[in-house]
Amino acid sequence: MSSTLERARTAVATSPELRRLVERGRAILLGPSDEALRQEQDESHWQPAVAAGSRWWQAALSALSGVVGATVIAASAPRWRLAVPSWRLSIPGIAQPGNSTQSTMWFLLGLILIGLGWLGLVYRAGRIADPRRAVVVVGAVIALWAIPVSLGPPLLSNDVYSYVAQGEMASRGIDPSSVGPVELGRNDFTSGADPVWRSAPAPYGPVAVMAARSAVELAGHDQVAAINFYRLIVWIGVVMAAIGIGMIAVGNGLSAAVAIAIGIGNPIMILHIIGGVHNDAIMFGFLALGLAAAQRDKKKLAVALIAAATAVKLPAAVGLLYLGWCWRGAIATWKERVVTTVAVFASSIAAIVVGCFFVGLGPGWITALTSTGKVNDTYSPTTKLGFSIAEILNGVGLDVNGQLLASGVRALGLLATAAIAFVMLMRSPRVGYIKATGVMLVAYVLLGPVIWPWYLVTGFALLAACGLGRYRPSYLVVCLAASWFVWPTSVVSMGTVGSGYQHLRGLGVVVLVITLAWGAQRFAARWERRYHGLSTTEREAAVSSELAEVDSTC
């Protein structure tokens, strides 16, 4: 046996092809080499040079663009047709329109303005010399953008009506994980809940249900007031997330202002998380603070915070997995890693069970997660691919069950997600549990059965706090594109517009986004190869000479 191993080692050592193959396999499973990690770290830690002048007008212009865009979207957003109309869910002095076409056109204009403002904010955040001042400026601009979308009706989603209905159920002693809001009978809470979820149990944990119950009870069981109280809870979650992302970025030697601008100031966060009043903000806040605490070696506090995030939405549990695996550092044995991971999960499960008992929540919220996978009109690549193949086959005369085919492709996507989870588990001692958590959250969303824009925020923001490096252009493109995936037509996915070959057209949109991200990446790489390392004066001179050459040839 030993002689066979020796011959294998000799063959690998003497064959460049075999050596490259072994190194590639090792990099896939265990991560890049120390030299590659140092190179990636240098690229991730690169920050743009601070401009000589303050140029506050650029920051002001970005802030103005974003606030105008947010105001346009909030002022033109239609009310949820099944909710009881109330002036308390509108911008004072502005009547909410009922025309979805008009709302959509204003939405597109507003989204362009917010997108431009966001890109400008990211650009300026890295060019303010004082780090503390940069964080204050970025935080103030994001808060300014969030105010208009917090005054109008809930944007681009009706989920908050279901949240407060579940909170009303919990306040009456009804378990929202076993029955849907229809159990409340006829009232404002039931009528406001989306018919899709009116009979469905809540797929949210005890912390989410307790937050909804608190909002309802503070509001005196008034539906509209409960929504506004829930908005306040979402704001608290966003602030927690911003603090956590900033702390993680500083711990990684990066600019907190840039990380917050990218991860918290993006259009998805402003329009979908804050404007749509999603409980993902609560999960995000606890998870970001927990990972930041672990980074500062406060691991028991980290487990408590990440367990709280898991008690909002179950996907946050990946943070527990990678934290437990990396608990004892890079030189721990497999046995030590398994023991600490089991201990982390056991303590977290015990805490969540106690929370469920306190709130009066059964285990149905875990099994209720499968109900979200029944939605087919999202931009999940696996869902679109399965239904698109069925549409093509049906178009040529073959009778194919699209739902069955899509289920098969979704299963393959989940298998790929499990494979990525294992690879990141092996890599996590080298790349870090924070980056591993971010990668896994993004992979789970992209390969899962359902994608809504607000699902992407948490993973993307964690990656931004770890340093996007050369991947920043594709990140910005995907984040901007995902903001367009839902239109304000109470609520209509962009893929449902028009008729015929709906899923095939949706798959085309996904392919277009991937192509644009790839193109932005290639363009930025070319630009970096040509101009990176030059001083500002040299870079401007190089660009000017190229423009002069173009003018001379025209």
Model-derived regions, located:
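Transmembrane-helix signature of polytopic, membrane-embedded enzymes
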Residues: 133-137, 245-266
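Multi-pass, polyprenyl lipid-linked donor-dependent membrane glycosyltransferases
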Residues: 232-236, 257-287, 293, 312
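Transmembrane-helix motifs of polytopic, lipid-linked glycan transferases
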Residues: 66, 115-122, 225-252, 418-424
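Transmembrane helical bundles and short interhelical boundary loops of multi-pass, membrane-embedded
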Residues: 3-6, 11-22, 34, 43, ...
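Perimembrane helix-loop-helix junctions
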Residues: 318-349
